[in-house]
């Protein structure tokens, strides 16, 4: 099988060449709401029922030092990247993905925060903070435990989210 990962508009000619197609989608981070992924996927499936649809990238930035009581998105190109928004974002996106059997796969962007010299956002310049674990690999963010609870049925645990919000 051949596959393509795309950030191009839906229905672009490149989408018709490969057996499988996946799109980078950041609804709820770079515009829109976290619930928009479900609407987009349903629309693509309706318009192009023969497409084998995947999500090649999805994620939202988060700093373990940015805590808030309210559930409001951060500014993707700014410094405020609240951890609770990242968790909400992943919960909404995973719900949309897991409820749609026509989505063949999805890929979280990213397991770890990573260096990105051109970035000046989040709590430190030069870091992409969309990871589920901090750059130094020492702290697992709340969204990490959301996926662990959904994907690992053997390791029973209780995790209290928003525990850093004091």
Task: Tell me what each language-model feature is.
Residues 1-166:
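Extended substrate-binding grooves/exosites of carbohydrate-active enzymes
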């Amino acid at each position: 099988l051949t596959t393509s990962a795309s950030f191009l508009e839906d229905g672009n000619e490149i989408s018709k060449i490969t057996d499988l197609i996946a799109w980078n989608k950041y609804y709820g981070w770079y515009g829109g709401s976290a619930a928009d992924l479900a609407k987009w996927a349903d629309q693509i499936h309706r318009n192009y029922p023969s497409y084998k649809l995947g999500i090649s990238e999805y994620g939202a930035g988060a700093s373990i030092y940015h805590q808030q009581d309210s559930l409001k998105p951060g500014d993707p190109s700014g410094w405020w990247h609240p951890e609770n928004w990242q968790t909400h974002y992943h919960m909404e996106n995973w719900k949309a993905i897991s409820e749609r059997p026509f989505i063949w796969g999805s890929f979280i962007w990213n397991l770890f925060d990573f260096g990105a010299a051109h970035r000046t956002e989040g709590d430190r310049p030069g870091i992409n903070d969309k990871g589920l674990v901090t750059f130094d690999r020492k702290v697992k963010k709340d969204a990490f435990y959301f996926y662990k609870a959904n994907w690992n049925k053997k390791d029973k645990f209780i995790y209290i989210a928003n525990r850093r919000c004091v």
